[in-house]
Amino acid sequence: MKKTLTTIIAATALVLTNGIGANGAVPEGRDTSNFRKWVNTIVDDEISEQLANMPNIEVGKGISFSPKDDSFKTTIRFRMQNLVGASFDKGMGVTEVNGQVRRLRLRFDGFIFSPKFIYSIQLGFTGSDAKPTPNGKSNLILDAIAYYKPNSSWNLGLGQAKIKANRAMLNSSGSLQFVDRSIVNSEFGGDRDFGLFGEYYYGGIDKFALAALASVTLGEGRNWGASNNGGLAYTGRLELFPLGRFHAKGEYVEGDTYHEETPKIMLGAGYSFNHRSQLTRGMKGSMLPGDETRNIGSYYADMIFKYRGFSFNADYMGRHAADPAGFASPSFVYTGSGVNVQASYLFDRKWEVAIRNSSMIPNREVRPFAGYKVWNQSTLGVTRYIIGHSLKLQLDLSFNQMAKPASPDYDRLAVRFQLELGL
């Protein structure tokens, strides 16, 4: 406001001092060049200042605000996934028709005071994201964490975020090449939790690199609050990049959307031990009956390969616990393992065809509760990228087959179509 007022006064002074006529003409002999330069400088400075303070808007990277003194930065992003689908039994009869906003999320990232003090906040508004926790707490918050980043190698965080256990879970649900993650990750994959996080990074894009990730968390999942069982979760993960890191953080994005010009590989392994967990799947699942708890261990091994539009991912993961079915109710801890393999090729950076095969194998003592000896799901997916993962259309077709199922009436075929839009 002060700057604008100065500009108006300067323009008025130009008219009065230099005797510019009503028709805009300057009387002969009057030299107004220097005065005009002064006025133009003020006007140009104001416009430049306004442009400098305007938010930066870029599709896929959100809306960013930062003052001219760089004392803070805030980036706002949102995304939504609208899904329709249908499931069919062995005789191709329709068993379910599905239409929903699968995800609707709002995210804030940035730093305060210094780029060394980073924060990340993410909220989820759909029923699957915001349904109450098993202990009845509000569950709107997905992420709320602050990091101290003393240099490019270290991150130290306190708050709620994804535990760094397996590749498939670390990938954002907005960066998938299928409508959703595999059945293997849905059962065995890690989840969000509250606690202390430490990360170490070494190397770069063109040379050997590694990442060492660890956390000590509450162990009961996101938004749990206080825990009275005395148990915590301890998680560690190591990632190796023999040929250097992926461009544009491609290790966290499915498919080779960057189109790596040289081969890139990631080899990863992780383990999470949840001491005295109150939930059937460690950081997620339903409550164990009564005051029951279990020590639950989850193990992970995965790899990624990308080269010129081709992408290959493989995941092996599982869970172990003592006496997983020793409860007075139907509750049980799913112990066993699973394998997921998927491959894709991106044509002209627009169309992607992907295939995936996922197998779940419960341990013998929990097979009666799981309802099968082996569950295998094969999926064919097609994605049309309009603006990368920020605006895309996805169609996938899944076929399910179970060995020794408890019921022969399980869904055999599922088709899903999803629109994803984000800023």
Model-derived regions, located:
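Detector for outer-membrane/organellar transmembrane beta-barrel domains
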Residues: 229, 239-243, 247-363
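Bacterial N-terminal signal peptides
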Residues: 9-17
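Outer membrane beta-barrel
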Residues: 62-222, 227-244, 263-266, 339-347, ...
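Bacterial N-terminal signal peptides that target proteins for export
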Residues: 1-9
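Outer membrane beta-barrel transmembrane domains
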Residues: 279-280, 344-394, 398
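Outer-membrane beta-barrel "beta-signal"
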Residues: 234-245, 382-384, 391, 410-423
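N-terminal periplasmic/intermembrane-space "pro-region" immediately following the signal or transit peptide
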Residues: 17-77
